Amino acid sequence: MKSVDLKILDARMREYLPAYATPGSAGLDLRACTEASLVIEPGQTVLVPTGLAIHIGDPRYAAMILPRSGLGHKHGIVLGNLVGLIDSDYQGQLMVSTWNRGTQPFTLDPMERLAQLVIVPVQQVAFNVVEDFDASERGAGGFGSTGRG
């Protein structure tokens, strides 16, 4: 199994290193590496530092920053860009675009779990211009064409 070297930018993170919660966990929790609590007003989007830098270094892998379901469902706190994609050659600190889509201000405390990091395989593709496609059962149907009528 490929391991990814995560570099720590902030010494406070020693006590809060990301870890898989269970053997079946896909994501690692990312924390708000801030000096003080941050109030995010309804409709506001802020960039929150995580204190972690990542360099995957292998183009067969990428990382995705995903929301934590409880924050979105209970408090309206989601990712401002919905999903953060981290390319294998990126070497900077991970920042979380955090959007309060709720109706109440939300206080984000230092080291609070904010998002999840998932490492995923990547397949780069080559394009081939063709005259037509081989027929498939679905064809060009989209936008619910295989569900309710």
UniProtKB/Swiss-Prot annotation:
Gene Ontology annotations of biological process type: dUMP biosynthetic process; dUTP catabolic process
MF GO annotations: dUTP diphosphatase activity; magnesium ion binding
Alphabetical UniProt keywords: Hydrolase, Magnesium, Metal-binding, Nucleotide metabolism
Binding residues annotated for substrate, in chain numbering: 68-70, 81, 85-87, 95
Domain of life: Bacteria
Keyword Metal-binding set for record: yes
Cofactor(s) named in the record: Mg(2+)
This enzyme's EC code(s): 3.6.1.23
Catalytic reactions of this protein: dUTP + H2O = dUMP + diphosphate + H(+)
Pathway assignment: Pyrimidine metabolism; dUMP biosynthesis; dUMP from dCTP (dUTP route): step 2/2
Keyword Metal-binding included in the entry's annotation: yes
Family per record: Belongs to the dUTPase family.
NCBIfam families for the chain: dut, PRK00601.1
Record function comment: This enzyme is involved in nucleotide metabolism: it produces dUMP, the immediate precursor of thymidine nucleotides and it decreases the intracellular concentration of dUTP so that uracil cannot be incorporated into DNA.
Name the record gives this protein: Deoxyuridine 5'-triphosphate nucleotidohydrolase
UniProt organism field: Bordetella pertussis (strain Tohama I / ATCC BAA-589 / NCTC 13251)
